């Protein structure tokens, strides 16, 4: 039996919305129709002015808060942030979580059936970008009669998605919270993504992305990709504090088996992820990260790119995040200030690295709460 805490969303369920209007993508491909899976928390007010959209990161999904009745251990990935009395208070806001187009948790993506062929899309599913997602967010809002989001919020890739909506449809959002994100990937980050992709692409079970029809899954490649990614999400201090050089069995074995606790942890994370995620979706999501660069059409001038934005911004970074360092957030802040937009910025002390945006941290949560409390609905 599930025991609900007073500040918990409680039991939730996912829903699905179908779109028949063709969607033209940035790649020039067209989806004749598609579906998005989503969850909502709280109540949409009569004015439809209290909606908040939460955008997920690379491996995230629509299950942002609460638990499922048939799987109470599957807690939403931002459950510590969203709920009655929490920083994003569902007594005030109507919070929406969407599994992005191209995802593998119910929204149309590589594992979905292509109505034209009767088979899974697989590698034929077109690459999608944050601009494509922004289009789907607007269409989703239209389904609910939401003319303007009170806020759009996201961490990591989710923060990039939030920025994209603020640029592509500035009239559709009043506040934007960009957390542990960047206005573009550095060469180092693109390199990390490519190595992760190569681990999948060179897995013998990948079969050019058509592993579904072969009855296989590139588990080894996906596992390695996740292990690499997980290293970049942590900080050296957090790894040292949690694992150090601790051995699994207390002594060296003088072989190539897993000996150190950090190795065991990475193998566990890789195995768990490979059981839950689709490899084609992983490839697609890393490309969405690589392609995000709003300044590209403005000769690299980020300030010029943000001239379209109208919303107020909250930008947060974490001191130990070396994947999307505070310097990247300060670049965003400068571009916003150059356009005389209202922006609040904080660099939060943390030892957890990039994953800090998911953690329970009093100062971090106080900052989010204070900002959200000041949003009028």
UniProtKB/Swiss-Prot annotation:
Substrate binds at residues 226, 355. PANTHER family: HOMOSERINE O-ACETYLTRANSFERASE. Belongs to the AB hydrolase superfamily. MetX family. GO terms for molecular function: homoserine O-acetyltransferase activity; homoserine O-succinyltransferase activity. GO terms for biological process: homoserine metabolic process; methionine biosynthetic process. Keywords: Acyltransferase, Amino-acid biosynthesis, Cytoplasm, Methionine biosynthesis, Transferase. It is found in: Cytoplasm. It catalyses: L-homoserine + succinyl-CoA = O-succinyl-L-homoserine + CoA. It holds the Pfam family Abhydrolase_1. The keyword Acyltransferase applies. Transfers a succinyl group from succinyl-CoA to L-homoserine, forming succinyl-L-homoserine. The record marks 323 as: Important for acyl-CoA specificity. It comes from Nitrosomonas eutropha (strain DSM 101675 / C91 / Nm57). Pathway: Amino-acid biosynthesis; L-methionine biosynthesis via de novo pathway; O-succinyl-L-homoserine from L-homoserine: step 1/1. The keyword Cytoplasm applies. Homodimer. The active site is at residues 156, 321, 354. The gene is metXS. Its EC number is 2.3.1.46. This is Homoserine O-succinyltransferase.
